[in-house]
Amino acid sequence: MSYAYQRFYRGPIEAVIFDWAGTTYDFGSMAPIRAFQNLFAEQEIPITLAEAREPMGTEKREHITRILNMPRVREAWREKYGALASEADIERLYHAFVPMQIEAIRECARPVPGLMETVAWLERRNIKIGANTGYNRDMLDVLTDIAAAQGYRPASNVCATDVPKGRPYPHMSLKNALELGVGDVRACIKVDDTLPGIEEGLAAGMWTVGVTTSGNEVGLSQEDWTALDSASKTVLREQAQERFRRGGAHVIIGSVADLPAAVEYIERWLAQGHGPDTTGLAGVTLTAAGVSLR
């Protein structure tokens, strides 16, 4: 004889695991961009905004490696230095990058509008809060100190250098879940503004929420975003939404201010016996009012 059974988690959301830059702090994820562009400018190989943003979400040494492997940058480096970038070059660049990144973090460390209201909403529902990042520990310590002084204190903070592999591997989110004491990964939501961050959450077996307006996929500072006309905002927002749909995000929101609607939507799915791996649930777009724009 053989037996098979299927378990469904039908309980509430227990934890939300946030990304940092572009999701909860630093609207537009500008600090990494400043640091990467400054780093390559010092090498006399300027990189574009698009080149700096493409690997966003990955661990920063890996981010540098991926930029160096871009065809245009690879050939520019060969022309400038007579050979392709070596492991020693990558290590040198990374050590030069760290202080640049820390300085940029200090300059850009402001909460995304709506963060504290959303945190208060989560706390009222006894939902635990964790966070992870592609920053290393020195970078993260600077950011968490600033955030704590402003009232944002995730109970678990994990950085890419704390685990064997960063995004898109699930290690950081799983470490967050362990530290938060979560009973089932299906009771967790990973919130991120990058596609590697969404892949991380999916690989961890969690629900995922993609963030468009405040994050890397739109890629504008708050001031530049505010200055756009409504038609331009719609185009950029819809382009970002489509990338998150293709990347498998379960729910897509504009910013952390919209997260309560996403949590309630996911809890309705859970009550119906659905899980993060249920076919056909990805790609729902929500507003703060909870209206589905799918």
Curated annotation (Swiss-Prot):
Transmembrane segments: none
UniProt GO MF annotations: magnesium ion binding; phosphoglycolate phosphatase activity; phosphonoacetaldehyde hydrolase activity
Enzyme class: hydrolase
Record Pfam families: Hydrolase
Catalytic residues, chain numbering: 19 (nucleophile), 60 (schiff-base intermediate with substrate)
Gene3D superfamilies: HAD superfamily/HAD-like, Putative phosphatase, domain 2
EC numbers on record: 3.11.1.1
Keyword Nucleus: no
Cofactor binding annotation: Binds 1 Mg(2+) ion per subunit.
InterPro entries: HAD-like_hydrolase_sf (IPR050155), HAD-like_sf (IPR036412), HAD-SF_hydro_IA (IPR006439), HAD_sf (IPR023214), PGP-like_dom2 (IPR023198), Phosphonoacetald_hydro (IPR006323)
Cofactor(s) needed: Mg(2+)
Subunit annotation: Homodimer.
NCBIfam families linked: HAD-SF-IA-v3, phosphonatase
Function: Involved in phosphonate degradation.
Family: Belongs to the HAD-like hydrolase superfamily. PhnX family.
HAMAP family: PhnX (MF_01375)
Protein name: Phosphonoacetaldehyde hydrolase
Organism: Hahella chejuensis (strain KCTC 2396)
Recorded name of the encoding gene: phnX
